[in-house]
């Protein structure tokens, strides 16, 4: 894509002026055209797409002796309050410092109710104790702060969260009786947003300083607020005002070391609606990941559920997994966190249902989409980037061709993959996806996948594709070509110099 853009720019410039200065100027444009789109590198080597598990699955083994196959998940953690030292640690309102909120069911005020009324220092002192308790060792892992009671952006506290606006206005009126309601509202907005910002910012700074090897971020940040799917003509897009509000949260993105958006579904969303809903939420998160530094974006780990929010015992179908997990992979996120509550592991029956679902639907699909993504990365990017849709709003997915592959569950309970890709399979990847380089890597995009000799990718022990492809018939004078999407390598320079030499020679002969 970048090479084609450069080609058009170059030849338009050359036709207008045959001067050397024009050619040199165009030459200098090359790096900016070839390095526009980066992705965060894998946090674990050779794991370009990370699967994490954040559900209390230990109940199935501990209480009911029903082990679940977790071999495909790299990081794991239970959301239960008494579990520590995990790969995924989630901090709810009662587990990290003194989070102020108002219980909307009972009306009870906790820790002052609003951020203006809590002692920030007392909160940070307690937070330090909590972080050291839940993370006794600073291993690589996820640190997810799940504070959903109020939002740091004043305008986003709509009903029923407008109680935080009302309390803030009341506080200002008590302290400044001479102010009119509009004046008190303006002052309340300023004080609330400043206190909320300081509260969230200092908390994540503390976490990063104490446990720097963990990936710190807030659950549901960023959010797209594209929940208007009952309206006619729904296309999933985020409202412009919400995109602007996400831009205004740059102070939060600058201190986060990962983003944790959510793509939970309910039964009111059809497969088509769910696809549009998820697609735009993930796309917005990836956009936000580049706000701190476009050349060094934050990793995006998307929270997903296996069940619906309004029917917690009804599992997503395979089509709905494509709409959620498949969308996330095709758009170039760093990974997915599967979250679950006690409802899916609270009884022997629910554990058996979960085990069956994982064996027959979830794990085969994870194997399918992850191997396809890894194969595409190996073929197109030489494993130095990820494959991303050329048309973000298309329904192109990274899937194995069912005509050429068979994923089987063997008698011992392990999965195996049988089959190998064809050149046509690889060409389809090349037609519909492009290579987005990892940060700070020299990333080559293969121009002709017919030159691929073999594919060798694995995602777990024995879950691999290891296949030799028939070598292409080479004609004299047409060696394999690579497009270099980094401006720092010798091969790129030589490629461009050769083009310039040929053009100048042609002009000189006229």
Swiss-Prot record:
UniProt topology in membrane: Lipid-anchor; GPI-anchor
Keyword match Oxidoreductase: no
Key words, A-Z: Cell adhesion, Cell membrane, Disulfide bond, Glycoprotein, Glycosidase, GPI-anchor, Hydrolase, Lipoprotein, Membrane, Signal
Glycan-modified residues: 82, 166, 235, 254, 368, 393, 440, 484
Top-rank taxon, per record: Eukaryota
Location of the active site: 148 (proton donor)
EC number(s) recorded for this UniProt protein: 3.2.1.35
One Gene Ontology term of the molecular function aspect: hyalurononglucosaminidase activity
Similarity remark: Belongs to the glycosyl hydrolase 56 family.
Protein name: Hyaluronidase PH-20
Origin species: Macaca fascicularis
